Amino acid sequence: NYHPASETIQALDENILLLKPAFQYSDNVAKEYENKCKNQIALKVEEILQNQGYKVISVDSSDKDDLSFAQKKEGYLTLSLSGEIVLRPDPKRTTQKKSEPGLLFSTGLDKMQGVLISAGFVKVT
């Protein structure tokens, strides 16, 4: 966990273009959480960069090739976030069904408990 410093440094003249995160999600991640996750990660990255003195411009695209010439010209850097978000079963909270060997299912009634693992990377281009 990165905790951005509460005091910010002097503002810089550089703009960083922050592309929408392009994540792949495992099938067991609920669809309504996908955008929430993308938005929270983008906001946290934006906060970190702003605390370092950069001006952040959020771009409504996840592909750097979609940027206009004007956007490329005004940007000092473009930040692209990609990776895979996987929800894995928690072995302590799941049991193996005898009729389906090797498969795990949740013992909860309507929710699956697990650990969210981000196997992504931050690529600066």
Swiss-Prot record:
GO cellular component: cell outer membrane
InterPro entries: NeuraminylLac-bd_hemagglutn (IPR007876), NeuraminylLac-bd_hemagglutn_sf (IPR038531)
Compartments (UniProt record): Cell outer membrane
Domain of life: Bacteria
Keywords assigned by UniProt, alphabetized: Cell outer membrane, Lipoprotein, Membrane
Residue ranges crossing the lipid bilayer per the database entry: none
Bilayer topology: Lipid-anchor
Keyword flag Membrane: yes
Pfam families documented for this protein: NLBH
Span list, region N-acetyl-neuraminyl-alpha(2,3)-lactose binding motif: 92-97
Identification of the protein by name: Neuraminyllactose-binding hemagglutinin
Lineage, highest ranks first: Bacteria, Pseudomonadati, Campylobacterota, Epsilonproteobacteria, Campylobacterales
Gene name for this UniProt entry: hpaA
